[in-house]
């Protein structure tokens, strides 16, 4: 069984792989970047799909819990990579999403 810290790190890594896999095609299509960026984008999305299989919970529960982490990581990406300041609404929304994710992920098993 994975520890809580390892599961959290796996969720974050999974989110980064998905975001990179979607951000690179966006750069090609919207920002005029070179088409070769589509190759690492495809690899990143394949990594994302594989990482989802490493999560210890049932697939649907993993996807539901992952959504909260994805929101938080996407907002971190917005701030760090895109340089867009976060609003208090962004932070509040991420906190709510992470709270919901915690309810799903940390429920009693048995």
Curated annotation (Swiss-Prot):
Any single GO CC term annotated in Swiss-Prot or TrEMBL for this entry: plasma membrane
Superkingdom of the organism of origin: Bacteria
Alphabetical UniProt keywords: Cell inner membrane, Cell membrane, Membrane, Transmembrane, Transmembrane helix
Topology within the bilayer: Multi-pass membrane protein
Cellular localization per UniProt: Cell inner membrane
Entry keyword annotation includes Cell inner membrane: yes
Primary subcellular site in the record, as a coarse category: membrane
Cell inner membrane is among the record's keywords: yes
InterPro entries from the UniProt entry: UPF0060 (IPR003844)
Chain ranges passing through the membrane: 9-29, 34-54, 64-84, 86-106
Family: Belongs to the UPF0060 family.
Protein known as: UPF0060 membrane protein BMA0761
Source organism: Burkholderia mallei (strain ATCC 23344)
């Amino acid at each position: 069984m994975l520890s809580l810290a390892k599961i959290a790190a796996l969720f974050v890594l999974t989110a980064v792989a998905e975001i990179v896999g979607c951000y690179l095609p966006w750069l090609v299509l919207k920002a005029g970047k070179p088409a070769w960026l589509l190759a690492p984008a495809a690899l990143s999305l394949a990594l994302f799909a594989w990482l989802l299989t490493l999560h210890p919970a049932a697939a649907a529960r993993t996807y539901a819990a992952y959504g909260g982490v994805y929101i938080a990581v996407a907002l971190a990406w917005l701030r760090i990579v895109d340089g867009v300041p976060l609003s208090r609404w962004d932070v509040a929304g991420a906190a709510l999403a992470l709270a919901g994710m915690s309810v799903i992920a940390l429920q009693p098993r048995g």
